[in-house]
Amino acid sequence: MKIRTLSGSVLEPPSAVRATPGTSMLKLEPGGSTIPKIPFIRPSFPGPAELAEDFVQIAQANWYTNFGPNERRFARALRDYLGPHLHVATLANGTLALLAALHVSFGAGTRDRYLLMPSFTFVGVAQAALWTGYRPWFIDIDANTWQPCVHSARAVIERFRDRIAGILLANVFGVGNPQISVWEELAAEWELPIVLDSAAGFGSTYADGERLGGRGACEIFSFHATKPFAVGEGGALVSRDPRLVEHAYKFQNFGLVQTRESIQLGMNGKLSEISAAIGLRQLVGLDRRLASRRKVLECYRTGMADAGVRFQDNANVASLCFASACCTSADHKAAVLGSLRRHAIEARDYYNPPQHRHPYFVTNAELVESTDLAVTADICSRIVSLPVHDHMAPDDVARVVAAVQEAEVRGE
């Protein structure tokens, strides 16, 4: 994929040494040796010289934000990557992209109706619903895919259709939902708009080979520094409907049109020129970096085949912010996390707690409704999230595998 700078030169693949955080060390025992810590996330960015070159060009153009040439070029490049039938609005971050998606798809709510959504996702999803005037109605997840459960949603819709404004579907962990077509059929049957939060999924594909971005009314992405495709802070709203994307552009600029008159509710959500410039560089060589992340997952699957962990369906074609796996029990999960800590490997257990267990929603329970979330509770009790990096060192991959295997062998 060829991308040009403001001066017209073609961007080359990023330098071999990309900007990454420093390495910390862990002392294994008093007076003992130390080993480098394997971080959970290792952001990969263009080097200082490349960033300086971009900033010099921005300064010379004296255009730092407000839909400058880098932002326009970046939006076109995103569309070229995702598919020419799609339309893209860039935004300052993924949360603003989600707010824009809800506003332009469902309209401004008055907190008297609900959006169906999984509890098993990042807490910003339910917060976005509240900010746009809707209440969360939490549904359960599928035990095999860990994605939102169609049957759980249908049970709510059949009883409470008049209270439901739409569906806010998460592609959990940025992995394309294998049942996306079934969800779209459900939404069409009940005449409900459906928005997809694909925050960590830029570069992922659905099971049919289609890249994430073109399903439902729209999909959103986050380009946060922790994501496989990152600019620091940034996001995008993607849709097949150009009118919806145009509304999103107005929403992120106070509802202004060319006459400088505001014709709709809006806010400031514009992507800066330096973030767009970083995004242009990050697109160069992206597929190679994502392939290297999928290779890590393949090594994990092979190496942990007898370790009692099961990885997520369809993750082999995802961009892989990290690798999620389910242990056999809560005790096994505790053993795996303990073994990883002893081996100086950072890990997490996303999404634990799920949204409905966060203190804000426990304290303000009147704001939400919920189905039975038995599967959500079970998966949360057994989930572990393992580190995945661009071009992860084979020795680091082997250390992660050995640590998980050790937990199974020790039977802690």
Curated annotation (Swiss-Prot):
Q: Which GO terms describe its biological process?
A: cellular response to iron ion starvation; iron acquisition from host; polysaccharide biosynthetic process
Keyword presence, Transmembrane helix: no
Q: Name a single GO cellular component.
A: extracellular region
* Protein's name in the database: Protein Rv3402c
For this UniProt record, give its keywords in alphabetical order, as a comma-separated list. Pyridoxal phosphate
- Native source species: Mycobacterium tuberculosis (strain ATCC 25618 / H37Rv)
Expression triggers: Transcriptionally repressed by IdeR and iron. Induced during infection of human THP-1 macrophages.
- Tell me the InterPro entries matching this sequence: DegT/StrS_aminotransferase, PyrdxlP-dep_Trfase, PyrdxlP-dep_Trfase_major
* PANTHER family associated with the record: PROTEIN RV3402C, TRANSAMINASE
